[in-house]
Amino acid sequence: MKAFWFRVRQLLYFYSRAVTKYQLHSPFVFDLANAVLEDSRWYYAFRDVEAVRNQMLASDVQLEVVDYGAGHSGSRTGKVTVRKVARDAASSRRQGQMLFRLADWARPRTLLELGTSLGIGTMYLAAAVRSARVVSLEGCPDFAKVARINLDLLDLKNVS
């Protein structure tokens, strides 16, 4: 696993300094750039995940926040709306699509996500590789409950 992240870091380093993808000398980096960074195809799951995101952006449901991580510099507890979390903390559309393409390209058997939030990133990952086991951890019980509801909406059963 460590080697995989080293290779991904190499990709980003080389890709950021290359003028074109053809100046990438590593075959791994070239393949990853083509399959993940240069891919502009619209996949079936994007529409479904974004429909769930739009539902969350319209939701005024209040959630109790329990933040065990770095979080904000303010309080670690309190209430927040689903809309605010979906707007400010969830994976963006671009990040989600990049996660989808990366998972689709790498075809892992197991994925681990730490800090699920509302499950947007999890939905992209689970939809990309339906045969993979996705383990998603969220410390805040209310966020985990919303994430589970969202995953059930898309019938993503490969997430635990």
Segments and roles (model prediction):
Residues 1-160:
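A short alpha-helical cap/connector motif
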